[in-house]
UniProtKB/Swiss-Prot annotation:
Keywords: 4Fe-4S, Iron, Iron-sulfur, Metal-binding, Methyltransferase, S-adenosyl-L-methionine, Transferase. [4Fe-4S] cluster binds at residues 62, 68, 71, 147. CDD domains: AdoMet_MTases. One of its GO terms (molecular function) is rRNA (uridine-C5-)-methyltransferase activity. This is Uncharacterized RNA methyltransferase CC_1326. Residues 1-52 form the TRAM domain. InterPro entries: MeTrfase_TrmA_AS, NA-bd_OB-fold, SAM-dependent_MTases_sf, TRAM_dom, U5_MeTrfase_fam. Its EC number is 2.1.1.-. The active site is at 373 (nucleophile). The keyword Transferase applies. GO terms for biological process: rRNA base methylation. Transmembrane segments: none annotated.
Amino acid sequence: MQDLTINAIGAQGDGLARTADGKPAFVPLTLPGEVVRAKMDGARGEVVEILAPSPERVAPACRHYGVCGGCALQHWAAEPYRAWKAEQVRLQLSMEGLETEILPTFAAPPASRRRVALHARKGGKGQGARLGFKERRSWNLVSIEECPVTDPRLVAALPALARLAEPFLEHPKSAPTLHVTLTATGLDIDITGVERKSGGLSADARMRAAMAAGEGDFARVTLAGETIYGARQPLVKLGQAVVALPPGSFLQAVPAAEKAMVELAVAEAQGASRVADLYCGVGTFTFPLAEVAQVYAAEMSAPAITALKAAIGGAPGLKPITAEARDLVRRPVLSTELAKTDVVVIDPPRAGAAEQTVEIAKSKVAKVLGVSCNPQTFAKDARVLVDAGFKLVRVTPVDQFVWSPHIELVGVFTR
């Protein structure tokens, strides 16, 4: 056992301290200024007792907190927690030698997440499937009965989702993950992690899965993209468009966070004639942007582009949209192709957009709106743009994954 003083919260949400011999220690579920007694395992500590609690400590919102690995910071009061999220953005920018105005963090409300990944395991003898999230720093499963982060309609479906998971556990090597999205027409579930080398899911298991899906009144169930049950098309509204989601497609996790980011993008596109929406997905930004400007949209996923194109005709009052399936890593939109583009909106995956950023930097584009789920790769791409003459005007942190260490952001560049 060691008594430790927590000096700060690290990037993964753990408390940072120094042991008696000066070595770094990482202690989860602690807060700055606290003195704790911890059981050490190498550099990691587990709190045994809080000797001096922080005045910023609050009661967690969830009974599973501390064991479930989904949340790391429920025990921290809202104001310092949000300030810490903004500081993580500032730190990553500073590592690339960048400074800018960081606006107040947009905080997504609890009980609003519409997209989750639930893991399924076999229950005990005579029991059904267990469904939940992984334990903190473990492969073990925490069976959940509540989740204050998630939309209550999805939480209410947990028993039906557990019944759906049972047929997918027929093979001992299967470890299913249910990727669940709440849409306007019901739950859309894509299931991965099912052993398929031994002939795949049996006919009996498919039949039982379809029956469970019907009883749960799900919109659609797919197995790694293959539809095994479809009562109705999963639909989402993006701007003025209604989009039919392809299986396994990306959608922002929290509608309020999506709305905030879209509003920022549309505000920056005011007065533009042509906008490029890169890594457009199914059109999260494309359709709202098309209310104010012509839009060129590019995305690697061909099914996403097909869904986007199919929705254009049913969306009234939009300016022209051109969309293509394009790998923006292997075939980024060239600077010459951006010659008549006024604004670029780019929302890459966590790895960033190094190849595409080089082409934007070489172009004559006057404004870039960067949306990112990874401040580290955003900062690296931002450095390239700034070196090419852009100014990073401001950044808005977006706390979409509330109580987790993850932070998203929207940055505005001009030149």
